[in-house]
Amino acid sequence: LDQSSCMICFYRIFYPKLKVYVIHHHFRYQEMSGIKRQLQYMLEWLGLGVSFAIITPNPYTHSLIKQMRPDSRTVFLEMAFKKDVPTCSCYVLKQLLFVGTVYQRKGLLYLLEAIGQMSEKERSGIHLDIVGDLSQKKYYKCLLSLVHLYGLEDIVTFVGRISDEELRSYYSRAYCFVFPSLLEGYGMVLIEAMSYGLPVIAFDNSAIPFTVKNDRNG
């Protein structure tokens, strides 16, 4: 379950005078179901409860913490972000880009299904680059099966993990950033994509609406 919460409780039990500050990104219990979800919720509740203060980078997570632990010392401290915007625009029309670890929470299944349900005319010219770690082999194979099912072999490319320099080139030539994540505590990659002038298509859930504003930047 959550090792961080266990460690916080350990320090508070054996070092009661120690002030533990926690930087909290998102709640892991939201990714679970059944008894695991209940146990994880309890661990996070305990961990936050014995913390001296909690720092969080997003109003969404801040509100959840206050619901869980109304008496907690919680500070919303927005994440600093510095990124040089490219001076030239060399995007490729209909070039879509996703950046993030390839696993279930990122919702790529829904993105591939959406493209797969397009007509041949609507798909024409579209290409999707999926950039990110592919270590979750079971989920990766599931996505490959979906690509094969919909005949998207020439449309979808799994790039894998790349260097920062290579990533900049992918951002520079992308026409639109797509991010079908089901849960985000912040979604820094959204800010990164916007720094390249990319419009963002994303689900309206968790912390995402605090960054992506409909008809303004996505």
Positions of PLM-derived features:
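Short alpha-helical donor nucleotide-sugar binding micro-motif in glycosyltransferases
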Residues: 161-162, 169-174
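Membrane-proximal helix-turn-helix segments that form the acceptor-binding/catalytic region
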Residues: 37-54
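Nucleotide-activated donor-binding/catalytic signature segment of Leloir-type glycosyltransferases, i.e.
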Residues: 132, 141-162
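Aromatic "clamp/platform" in nucleotide-sugar-dependent glycosyltransferases that forms part
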Residues: 182
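A conserved mid-protein helix/loop that constitutes part of the nucleotide-sugar donor-binding site
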Residues: 94, 101-117, 128, 138-141
